[in-house]
Amino acid sequence: GHGAYQAPDWTADWLHRELTNWLDITANQEFGKNFADLNDEQQTLLKARLTKEYRGSKVENGTVVLSNTRLAAMEKTAQYYISLYGDDPATKVTREHFAMKDNTLPDLQARKDLAKFFFWTAWTASAERPNTHASYTNNWPHEPLINNVPTPENVIWSIASVVFLIAGIGFVV
């Protein structure tokens, strides 16, 4: 985000929006209703497929392989960001909440490129590295829809960094 107090972490925001779009698209294709309107069993089934698709996403011959459903979810998510960073009245209130000016990125191509960048950061945060159960970002940011939780290494190094910081400040003082 830009300051964390005003706007979201864009990677986390994109990832969550794309996941919920995927769930709604799939629910409508298979059950004829939105994900929130499904029963618990149907929701559990779709969440398991969602996790498998996103955590199992990989690169083959230098190309990220994505399903048609994921491509549709990405496009819907991209349209939100193109709107948000433009001057679309539909996202004006959100821009105000995020302390963003209208037409933050006036150039449409720049907005499309930004959306592609946000997708890429979300992909690295959700796809597991080969031969591991951790994403390229060590399962950060946290995203419960796909069981993206910080690895033990994340927790250990976070605690260690705070200890080193306090020790360093104590040494200087």
Please identify what each model-predicted range represents.
Residues G1-V155:
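Soluble extramembrane regions of membrane proteins in the secretory/endomembrane system
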Residues T151-L165:
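N-terminal membrane-entry
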Residues A167-V173:
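Juxtamembrane interface at the cytosolic side of transmembrane helices
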